[in-house]
Amino acid sequence: MSIPSLPAGYDVTKRVGSGRSDCHITVGFDREGTHIPRFLVLLHYQVSADPLQWDAIARMDHNETAALGHDIYKEGLHVDIARRYESAVHVEISDNLLPSIRGIVIRGCTDYLEKNTQYFIDVFEGDQSAANPPKWPDGGESPHTLISTKHVNTGMSKEQSREDPSEEVISMDELTEILAEAEGVTPEE
């Protein structure tokens, strides 16, 4: 099976089932003891069958360690959305109060991308505006902010597919267990 690459440069990387054959979700995160200081969640979309090519069309991330990193606890959640024929957009997603347990936030990001895959594909293809994105599961009420930025494109990946049967696709529940173990909590917390 041809698949997009896992995020590079992270302590832990996983591929999570997306429920679609034309999409993959990948997750990368770092560990410092039982703390996760940075993570990346990507939604990959198959943009070409011949040659097979995957693009990362939606990106959610957190990095509290880098000077130019995005700290979701200070700046809020956002999604960078690639567009096929225009520059990428940065959409701020309102949330009420994010849990301090990063694993819960990462799982929330994977759920958000999985449940709203068609929205991200439609924005990528130009069939829908990025304005008024789906709400974050906690129902945050602040208005969404849409910022068109060209620098977002440089962080999104366009890659050829690759073969690696050793990289299994895990379920959302398996991801939850991995994240809980990384933070030294139980999956129910």
Summary of predicted features, one role per range:
Residues 1-2, 151, 159:
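Short Lys/Arg-rich cationic patches that frequently serve as NLS/NoLS or arginine-rich RNA/DNA-binding motifs
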Residues 63-151:
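Mixed-charge, Lys/Arg-enriched low-complexity segments
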Residues 38-82:
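Acidic, aromatic-enriched beta-alpha/helix-loop junctions
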Residues 155-189:
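DE-rich, low-complexity intrinsically disordered acidic tracts
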Residues 1-55:
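Negatively charged, low-complexity tracts enriched in Asp/Glu with abundant Ser/Thr
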Residues 13, 21-23, 73, 80, ...:
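Intrinsically disordered, low-complexity, compositionally biased regions/tails
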